[in-house]
Amino acid sequence: MQFTKMSAFATLALATLAAATPTRRNDSPSNQCNTGSLQCCNSLQSANSASLAGLLGLLGVVVGTITGQVGVTCSPITGVGVSGTSCSEQPVCCTNNAFNGVIALGCSPININL
């Protein structure tokens, strides 16, 4: 009988300890892109947008090859949370920013947790 009580107490104590053990949290900002670079664009448009067609044509971009959205007037975001670095528009991850900030291709909106 004594062994049963001791066994039950040990089981209960271990269960309580396991439930109270702190776990590591990852509170770092999600400021990394899985692919491409983090950008701040003045607008984000569909690749087949009529208002964007002329600009894409001037830059020689074939609309059918674009996946994702197109960011217009983009600048890189570096050092998220650093004083002076801000993005008043939707931050995006873009896979092709080879157009000197005029446009960025393959953009997906992201959430930056500060």
Curated annotation (Swiss-Prot):
<dbReference type="InterPro" id="IPR001338">
    <property type="entry name" value="Hydrophobin"/>
</dbReference>
<feature type="disulfide bond">
    <location>
        <begin position="40"/>
        <end position="87"/>
    </location>
</feature>
<dbReference type="GO" id="GO:0005576">
    <property type="term" value="C:extracellular region"/>
</dbReference>
<comment type="subunit">
    <text>Self-assembles to form functional amyloid fibrils called rodlets. Self-assembly into fibrillar rodlets occurs spontaneously at hydrophobic:hydrophilic interfaces and the rodlets further associate laterally to form amphipathic monolayers.</text>
</comment>
<dbReference type="GO" id="GO:0009277">
    <property type="term" value="C:fungal-type cell wall"/>
</dbReference>
<keyword id="KW-0134">Cell wall</keyword>
<keyword id="KW-0964">Secreted</keyword>
<keyword id="KW-0732">Signal</keyword>
<feature type="signal peptide">
    <location>
        <begin position="1"/>
        <end position="20"/>
    </location>
</feature>
<feature type="disulfide bond">
    <location>
        <begin position="94"/>
        <end position="107"/>
    </location>
</feature>
<keyword id="KW-1015">Disulfide bond</keyword>
<comment type="function">
    <text>Aerial growth, conidiation, and dispersal of filamentous fungi in the environment rely upon a capability of their secreting small amphipathic proteins called hydrophobins (HPBs) with low sequence identity. Class I can self-assemble into an outermost layer of rodlet bundles on aerial cell surfaces, conferring cellular hydrophobicity that supports fungal growth, development and dispersal; whereas Class II form highly ordered films at water-air interfaces through intermolecular interactions but contribute nothing to the rodlet structure.</text>
</comment>
<feature type="disulfide bond">
    <location>
        <begin position="41"/>
        <end position="74"/>
    </location>
</feature>
<dbReference type="Pfam" id="PF01185">
    <property type="entry name" value="Hydrophobin"/>
</dbReference>
<protein>
    <recommendedName>
        <fullName>Class I hydrophobin 1</fullName>
    </recommendedName>
</protein>
<feature type="disulfide bond">
    <location>
        <begin position="33"/>
        <end position="93"/>
    </location>
</feature>
<comment type="similarity">
    <text>Belongs to the fungal hydrophobin family.</text>
</comment>
<dbReference type="GO" id="GO:0005199">
    <property type="term" value="F:structural constituent of cell wall"/>
</dbReference>
